[in-house]
């Protein structure tokens, strides 16, 4: 779809959406997302120029159907896929991608850490019509025996290679600085971000500052050539409730705000990653803090989990926090699966995580009165009241599961037009009872109106 759009920009030094927006240009991508979001194209352009909206759309990813992430857009969700050093393969990752697309993930991140990482990423990119993100530090580690052996040159080389391949956004842990490491020393769970821990290890081993920070402007130069969006990593995010909203987290967040504005000077798009594990009552404050420190750049949050006691159910503990975060301004939610803290997610875990987060994002869109956000809810409610079971399944976030649940007790097709379910049966269905009451009331009203319009029997009206 984007091949012709991209061809017109070939040879330009900066092809980022922010660059064009600041020049007053409404790109084809901006017009496309405006239609998707029911927004005016000029509003999209202004939001991208301001930095409050991003359109991750690498010019080397022509398969992409552009989308917007920002406070004026519907809340988006990301699903993580990718192998580990001990399990998974290309076919399995592509199967996960198909599940992501089926159930409505807005973006995917390839977090592969083993095998032929570029080959896996290439397969995902060519099959993905949604933005693809990565964490470059993972591939960097595949080229060295020890994290201490990483060089800035290698890191920039890997970033350039991923950009040239078509990656739309990258998590860059540039805000984990040497001075911040001691701030996390007394945490219960320490540094829980893989990228954050790796950069801390590198800095301690090399007695030097974070190379993502010292070489940030070189990364900006790469990103603007391909239109890669920064996803500034929260390497010091809290990994448990006790560590939430501490000095380490907010020191890094302030640094990410400075880096956001630095990237904007280069015309590069930015979103900022956020926690993590946060008590429910602290979530609004965390959202406000990001807006304040990061000049309203889109906030991309992992959950947050609102309790630490439910391994196996962290798609639920985090979706609760995600809904609150989105209601208070988070622009994109990174899903959490039932396998979180326990192992590598399988396809079923991916599906459950996506559905949980689609619910959270949708609930926030309804609460924020997004244009058309409640249309599907109202349509399903009407189908429910009309006992149109097939329409209810069709409108569900997960039609297969909705139908399967109905089939468990009423499997025959005849029951798909029945005016009851197995919970209440035909005698106790409140909607059926109300339907009869409504019909009776309507009949009474009609009779009353007819009687009022008709002269009383036996009386003659004299001229």
UniProtKB/Swiss-Prot annotation:
GO MF, any single term: zinc ion binding
One GO biological process term: thiamine biosynthetic process
Enzyme Commission number(s) from the entry: 4.1.99.17
Cofactor: how and how many bound: Binds 1 [4Fe-4S] cluster per subunit. The cluster is coordinated with 3 cysteines and an exchangeable S-adenosyl-L-methionine.
UniProt-annotated binding residues for Zn(2+): 277, 341
Residue numbers binding substrate: 80, 109, 138, 173, 193-195, 234-237, 273, 300
Chain residues that bind [4Fe-4S] cluster: 421, 424, 429
Pathway: Cofactor biosynthesis; thiamine diphosphate biosynthesis
Gene3D superfamilies: 6.10.250.620, Radical SAM ThiC family, central domain (3.20.20.540)
InterPro entries: ThiC (IPR037509), ThiC/Bza_core_dom (IPR038521), ThiC/BzaA/B (IPR002817)
Keyword terms of this UniProt record: 4Fe-4S, Iron, Iron-sulfur, Lyase, Metal-binding, S-adenosyl-L-methionine, Thiamine biosynthesis, Zinc
Essential cofactor(s): [4Fe-4S] cluster
Reaction(s) the record says it catalyses: 5-amino-1-(5-phospho-beta-D-ribosyl)imidazole + S-adenosyl-L-methionine = 4-amino-2-methyl-5-(phosphooxymethyl)pyrimidine + CO + 5'-deoxyadenosine + formate + L-methionine + 3 H(+)
Cellular component terms per the entry's GO annotation: cytosol
UniProt record similarity statement: Belongs to the ThiC family.
Subunit composition and interactions: Homodimer.
Function: Catalyzes the synthesis of the hydroxymethylpyrimidine phosphate (HMP-P) moiety of thiamine from aminoimidazole ribotide (AIR) in a radical S-adenosyl-L-methionine (SAM)-dependent reaction.
Name used for this protein in its record: Phosphomethylpyrimidine synthase
Organism whose genome encodes this protein: Anaeromyxobacter dehalogenans (strain 2CP-C)
């Amino acid at each position: 779809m984007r091949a012709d759009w991209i061809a017109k920009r070939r040879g330009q030094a900066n092809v980022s959406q922010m660059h064009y927006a600041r020049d007053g240009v409404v790109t084809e991508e901006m017009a496309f997302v405006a239609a998707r979001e029911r927004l005016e194209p000029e509003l999209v352009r202004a939001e991208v120029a301001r930095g409050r909206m991003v359109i991750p759309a690498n010019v080397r990813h022509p398969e992409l159907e552009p989308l917007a992430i920002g406070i004026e857009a519907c809340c988006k969700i990301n699903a993580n896929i990718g192998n580990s050093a001990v399990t998974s393969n290309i076919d399995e990752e592509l199967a996960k991608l198909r599940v992501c697309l089926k159930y409505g993930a807005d973006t995917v991140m390839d977090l592969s850490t083993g095998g032929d990482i570029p080959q896996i990423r290439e397969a995902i990119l060519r099959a993905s019509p949604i933005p693809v993100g990565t964490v470059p530090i993972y591939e960097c580690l595949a080229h060295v025996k020890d994290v201490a052996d990483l060089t800035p040159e290698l890191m920039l080389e890997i970033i350039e290679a991923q950009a040239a391949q078509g990656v739309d956004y990258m998590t860059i842990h540039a805000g984990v600085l040497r001075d911040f490491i001691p701030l996390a020393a007394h945490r219960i769970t320490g540094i829980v971000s893989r990228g954050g821990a790796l950069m801390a290890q590198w800095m301690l081993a090399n007695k030097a500052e974070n190379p993502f920070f010292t070489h940030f402007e070189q990364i900006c130069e790469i990103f603007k050539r391909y239109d890669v969006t920064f996803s500034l990593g929260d390497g010091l995010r809290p990994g448990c409730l006790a560590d939430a909203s501490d000095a380490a987290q907010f020191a890094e967040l302030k640094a990410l705000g400075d880096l956001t504005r630095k990237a904007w000077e280069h015309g590069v798009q930015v979103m900022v990653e956020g926690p993590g594990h946060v008590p429910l009552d602290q979530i609004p404050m965390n959202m406000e803090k990001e807006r304040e420190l990061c000049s309203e750049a889109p906030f991309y949050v992992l959950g947050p989990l609102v309790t630490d006691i439910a391994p196996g159910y962290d798609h639920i503990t985090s979706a609760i926090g995600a809904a609150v975060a989105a209601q208070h301004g988070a622009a994109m939610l990174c899903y959490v699966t039932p396998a979180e803290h326990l192992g590598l997610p399988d396809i079923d875990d991916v599906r459950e995580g996506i559905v949980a987060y689609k619910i959270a994002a949708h609930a926030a869109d309804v609460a924020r009165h997004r244009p058309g956000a409640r249309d599907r809810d109202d349509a399903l409610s009407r189908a429910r009241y009309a006992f149109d079971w097939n329409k209810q399944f069709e409108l569900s976030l997960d039609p297969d599961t909705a139908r399967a649940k109905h089939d468990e007790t009423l499997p025959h097709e005849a029951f798909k037009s029945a005016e009851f379910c197995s919970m209440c049966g035909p005698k106790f269905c409140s909607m059926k009872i109300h339907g009869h009451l409504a019909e009776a009331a309507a009949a009474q009203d009609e009779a009353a109106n007819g009687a009022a319009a008709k002269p009383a029997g036996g009386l003659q009206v004299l001229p």
